[in-house]
Structure formats: structure tokens, C-alpha cells
Amino acid sequence: MTMELESQEVVVETTTAAAAARAASAAHVRTTVALRLLAFAASLAAAVVVATNRQERWGITVTFKMFAVWEAFVAINFACAAYALLTAVFVKKLVSKHWLHHMDQFTVNLQAASTAGAGAVGSVAMWGNEPSGWYAVCRLYRLYCDRGAVSLALAFVAFVAFGVASSLSRYPRAPPPPAPR
């Protein structure tokens, strides 16, 4: 006579759940790495586009160093690109760390703030604000403004990729559905 205990049944279910979690973890790691590499590429491209952006007209050369917000944009995008690359490389070791989500949130907020600040300055440059004495200058420096718009679009892509990666770091794996009885 064999007697089956409840604890034996739970052990079998737990083992199956652990195997399902490992399988979900591999897909989770691949997705996280892909998102972080996308954020790396977009942040790096946005920073490089702005850092190399310059236009000369009538003896006046416009560069990103003329505006503090663009300097901050470049610095933050380089920092976010470095963070994205480091976390993409070490994601298998970091996926279980609780502080990863907090750092991801910090990075998302930095990316959002730098993109919003640069976008606000770009908006004033594009359309101006005549009551305050700011005139639209993008008619004169069209190439500079177009490259700035491209870098803002790239930074927004990085922001979205960081946001999704941050969500995945908060909920690293979905629990398997309960077994039917």
C-alpha cells in the first residue's frame, strides 16, 4: 500500500513551476537585452547627432555648446547609453537585483527630463515667443534645427525602450498559470 501525501504533490507542482519560470526567464532576458541595446543605440545616436551638429550662417556658427540644455542633453544621453550597455551585458546577473528597477526608473526620468528640456528649447527655436522677445530662428538655421529634431526623436525612442525595460525589471517573470485539477 502506497500512501501519497499532499506535500509530495506540492513538490511536483513546485518543480514544474520552477521549470516554467526558467523558460520564461530566458525569454525575459532576451527581451530585456534587446530593449537595453535599442536604448543604447538610440541614446548614443541622439548624443552624437547633437554633439556634431553645427551650422554657420553670416559668420555665426551655431553649436550645441551655445545652449546649456543641449549640453545637458548630450551628457545625459551619453550616461544613459553607458548605463544601457552595461546593464545589457550583465542582465543575467542583475535581473534578480531589487535595485535594478530603481536605477531603471532613475534613468527613465533622466531621459524624459533631458528630452523635454531640449524639446522646449527646440519649440521656442522653431516657433518663437514674440511677447518675450524670442524669435523663431529655425528659418535661418534649418539644418541645425532639423538635426535637433532627429535627435529628439531618437531620444524619445530611447525613453520608450528604457520605460519598457524598467517595467520588465519591476516584474521580471510572470508566474505560471495554476495547474488544472
Swiss-Prot record:
GO terms for cellular component: plasma membrane. It is found in: Cell membrane. Pfam families: CASP_dom (PF04535). This is CASP-like protein UU-1. It is a multi-pass membrane protein. It comes from Sorghum bicolor (Sorghum). The keyword Membrane applies. Homodimer and heterodimers. Residues 52-65, 129-147 are extracellular.
